[in-house]
Structures are given as structure tokens and as C-alpha cells.
Regions:
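N-terminal beta-strand motif that seeds the catalytic metal site of vicinal oxygen chelate
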Residues: 1-18, 75-78
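Core segments of cupin and vicinal oxygen chelate
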Residues: 12-54, 94
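Exposed loop/turn and edge beta-strand positions of beta-sandwich/beta-sheet ligand-binding modules
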Residues: 41, 74, 109
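Vicinal oxygen chelate
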Residues: 2, 35, 46, 89-127
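Mid-chain, well-packed structural core segment of small domains
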Residues: 71-86
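Short, charged/polar surface micro-motifs in flexible loops or helix N-caps
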Residues: 50-54, 62-63, 85
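Short amphipathic alpha-helices within nucleic acid-binding modules
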Residues: 22, 86-91
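A short, acidic/glycine-rich surface segment
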Residues: 32-34, 41-43, 62-68, 101
Length: 127
């Protein structure tokens, strides 16, 4: 078996326009496809993260609230690899996104921090 790359990660959001603004206009992901699915009454937005990975965003009417405890079963957070955590934190601040204080990962020895998307999903920056 050769599972070489992650093709996509799918998330459900509560506010389609807020999520689209966050991931496209603030994080800079490009739109691949955007579709309203009337039979499901939801939006599906496919975004290019890099040459290998896509982020699928689903926005449906009245989704259940996200469990507020990150240790609940399921997706805990998304982590993005960056060359410089400091530079990326500064770039995020320029578009109004606050990050936690930068710290060193106890296991990798690399700099890291967290911020949150428009629904409170934790997003990590990791060198």
C-alpha cells in the first residue's frame, strides 16, 4: 500500500461567506470549484492549499455546533508547515487574525503557534 499524500481535508462550516473570506482572502487559498447543491441545500467549495492538497468546505443549513473541547473524537486541528512562524504570524496580523504566543514544540523542537478559523477550528503553524 502506498498512501503517499493527503489529497484533501473536508470541514463543515456554519457561515459560508465568512469561511470563504477567511480561507480565500485572508489565508490566500485559491478556488478550484464552487457549487451550490440544491438537493442537499448546501455549498461545496474546493480550495487549493498547495500542489497536492485541497481543502473542501461544506456549508449546510444549521450544522451541529463544533465540540468546544479539542480532545473530543474527530478532527482536532489542521497544521500548516511554514518556513517562518514569526513571518506568518505577522502576515496574519496584517489581515486581522490573532495568533497564540509562539512556542517551541516539546517533541519536534520546532517553533509553532495556533490561530482559529471563522468557526473556531484550531489551525496550527509549524516550522
Amino acid at each position: 500500500m502506498n498512501l503517499s499524500k493527503i489529497h484533501h481535508i473536508a470541514i463543515i462550516v456554519s457561515d459560508y461567506e465568512a469561511a470563504k473570506d477567511f480561507y480565500v482572502n485572508k489565508l490566500g487559498f485559491s478556488v478550484i470549484r464552487e457549487n451550490y447543491r440544491p438537493e442537499r441545500k448546501d455549498w461545496k467549495l474546493d480550495l487549493r492549499v498547495n500542489e497536492y492538497t485541497e481543502l473542501e468546505i461544506f456549508a449546510e443549513e444549521n450544522p451541529p455546533k463544533r465540540v468546544n473541547r479539542p480532545e473530543a473524537c474527530g478532527l482536532r486541528h489542521l497544521a500548516f508547515c511554514v518556513e517562518s512562524v514569526e513571518q506568518t504570524v505577522n502576515e496574519l496580523a496584517e489581515v486581522g487574525i490573532e495568533c497564540e504566543p509562539i512556542r517551541v514544540d516539546d517533541y519536534t523542537g520546532k517553533k509553532m503557534t495556533f490561530f482559529h478559523d471563522s468557526d473556531g477550528l484550531p489551525l496550527e503553524l509549524h516550522e
